């Protein structure tokens, strides 16, 4: 069964009124706060840790409830950001003279009417079992347990027409990469078993996988997201893959059990939004070109409580990038560059880079006028002097000019960061280059890099709180981004695209 719903929250009309009022004040506010010319070569002194800390605790506090993409909380946080930009003195650069560019995201999930039974155990998706993909299924078959699924284990059992249960086993990479190893292994092995004749696959966690069952399965509850018509909106039928906790192992082993699974799928449409603002350039010709400072305002919202905390605030991911981008805006307002500075806070990044994908497809300035993208993604954790540029080395580097500008600027702030290069390599298990908002721009040959301080143990957990952020580090990375952008924004020539640039996937 497929159900389609078009969801616009009942309180959205009140939000629309607020947005309208903000549009009115944005125009008048900009007229009253035009950037001053200033006398300094740049305005790096406008980037202050006190501003960054204040904004961080506001945006990543419980008031905005984790800013989940497609929710009223994301919209409320977006209005707050736009109001800060108006007060700073930026010009609205979204649709229809506002700070906003609205778009729709489509969500596909497993319905509450879906049923899952193994023997006498009635299981609920999202609680004591998780179905890995929201696909239509109807299975009623004998369950066979095949140990850890080794060739020797499988040789002893006829799996054709059966639901196959197996215990997860295998030592993966370190914790920060284990999640991708876990899901990759489960999906790959399940595909092999289904190809060999299994009609369903049931995974039971081992001790290491169990911690991820408890921490990372909230995304499976949500389902899949995409822009309308995107690949994740397609609803299809397939043999189900089920994930169980380690506590299920003893009863799953029992012989003679029946596996019954009826999966129904439903689809929803939600509003999300990009926030777009600019500081016009001062050069009569170059002001028609833009250097784009990119970030995203959404996170994971309200989810299953961990240690009593159900609000996943996303202080590092990515309130840190947002407050940095606001600080960059203050500097460009104080001292405009020759080229225009464009600031884009992308919505629904956590749902699959949806806001940046939408903006690249429907930019509010001519796409060819964007000379470079500097993306801020998680810049507030780990060692104070460590950082990473995504897009620094081939095949991810698409502009040596832009990368060299960033490397030079790294030596000019008084805090020279030691740059990690491993996470930008194509064989890194996290595939970090492909997971932030610079990517859609790079795919259309716009010079693009991302500044990041990389993952940490609180990534996508309720422990990603503002109290854990190194605001001094955020300030220093912001100044580094500023000097890079200031350089590019004032050069006579725009940075060139590397000849033959092609991503590995």
Put a short name on every predicted segment:
Residues 31-92, 154, 215, 288-290, ...:
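N-terminal hydrophobic or amphipathic helices/low-complexity stretches enriched
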Residues 122-124, 239-251, 337, 346-450:
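Metal-dependent peptidase/peptidase-like ectodomains
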Residues 125-231, 280:
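Extracellular/luminal Protease-associated
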Residues 35-40, 114, 121-157, 227-314, ...:
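Soluble metallo-hydrolase cores and metallopeptidase-like ectodomains found primarily
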Residues 65-175, 405:
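Noncatalytic luminal/extracellular "stalk/propeptide" segments of secretory-pathway proteins
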Residues 330, 334, 339, 456-505:
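His/Asp/Glu-rich mid-to-C-terminal helical/loop segments that flank catalytic regions of hydrolases
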Residues 294, 301, 428-477:
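Zn-dependent metallopeptidase/amidohydrolase metal-coordination segment
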Residues 14-26:
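Bacterial N-terminal signal peptides
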């Amino acid at each position: 069964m497929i159900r389609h719903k078009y969801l616009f929250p009942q309180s959205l009309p009140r939000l629309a009124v607020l947005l309208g009022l903000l549009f009115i004040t944005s125009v008048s506010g900009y007229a009253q706060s035009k950037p001053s010319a200033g006398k300094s070569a740049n305005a790096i002194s406008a980037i202050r840790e006190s501003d960054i800390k204040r904004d961080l605790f506001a945006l990543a506090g419980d008031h905005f409830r984790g800013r989940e993409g497609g929710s009223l909380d994301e919209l409320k946080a977006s209005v707050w950001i736009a109001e800060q930009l108006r007060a700073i003195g930026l010009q609205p650069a979204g649709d229809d003279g506002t700070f906003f560019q609205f778009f729709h995201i489509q969500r596909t999930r497993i319905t509450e009417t879906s049923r899952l039974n193994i023997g006498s155990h009635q299981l609920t998706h999202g609680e004591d079992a998780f179905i890995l993909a929201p696909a239509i299924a109807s299975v009623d078959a004998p369950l066979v347990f095949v140990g850890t699924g080794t060739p020797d284990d499988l040789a002893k059992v006829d799996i054709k027409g059966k639901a196959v249960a197996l215990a997860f086993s295998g030592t993966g990479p370190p914790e920060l990469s284990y999640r991708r190893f876990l899901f990759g292994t489960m999906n790959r092995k399940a595909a092999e078993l289904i190809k060999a004749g299994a009609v369903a696959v049931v995974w039971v966690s081992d001790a290491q996988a169990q911690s991820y069952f408890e921490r990372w399965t909230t995304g499976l509850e949500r389902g899949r997201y995409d822009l309308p018509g995107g690949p994740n909106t397609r609803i299809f039928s397939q043999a189900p893959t089920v994930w169980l906790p380690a506590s299920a192992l003893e009863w799953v082993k029992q012989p003679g059990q029946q596996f019954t699974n009826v999966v129904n799928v439903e689809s929803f449409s939600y509003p999300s939004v990009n926030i777009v603002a600019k500081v016009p350039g001062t050069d009569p010709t170059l002001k028609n070109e833009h250097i784009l400072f990119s970030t995203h305002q959404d996170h994971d919202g309200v989810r299953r409580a961990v240690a009593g905390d159900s609000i996943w605030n996303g202080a590092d991911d990515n309130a840190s990038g947002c407050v940095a981008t606001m600080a960059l805006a203050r500097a460009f307002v104080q001292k405009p560059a020759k080229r225009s500075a464009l600031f884009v806070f992308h919505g629904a990044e956590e749902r699959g880079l949806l806001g940046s994908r939408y903006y690249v497809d429907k930019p509010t300035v001519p796409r060819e006028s964007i000379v470079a993208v500097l993306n801020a993604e998680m810049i507030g954790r780990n060692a104070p002097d460590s950082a990473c540029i995504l897009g620094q080395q081939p095949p991810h580097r698409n502009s040596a000019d832009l990368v060299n500008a960033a490397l030079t600027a790294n030596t000019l702030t008084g805090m020279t960061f030691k740059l990690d290069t491993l996470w930008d390599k194509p064989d890194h298990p996290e595939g970090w280059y492909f997971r932030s908002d610079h990517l859609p721009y790079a795919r259309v040959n716009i010079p693009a890099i991302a500044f990041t301080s990389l993952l940490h143990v609180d990534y996508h957990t309720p422990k990603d709180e503002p109290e854990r952020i190194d605001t001094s580090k955020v300030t220093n990375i912001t100044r580094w981004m500023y000097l890079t952008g200031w350089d590019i924004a004032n050069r006579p020539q725009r940075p060139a695209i590397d000849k033959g640039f092609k991503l590995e996937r």
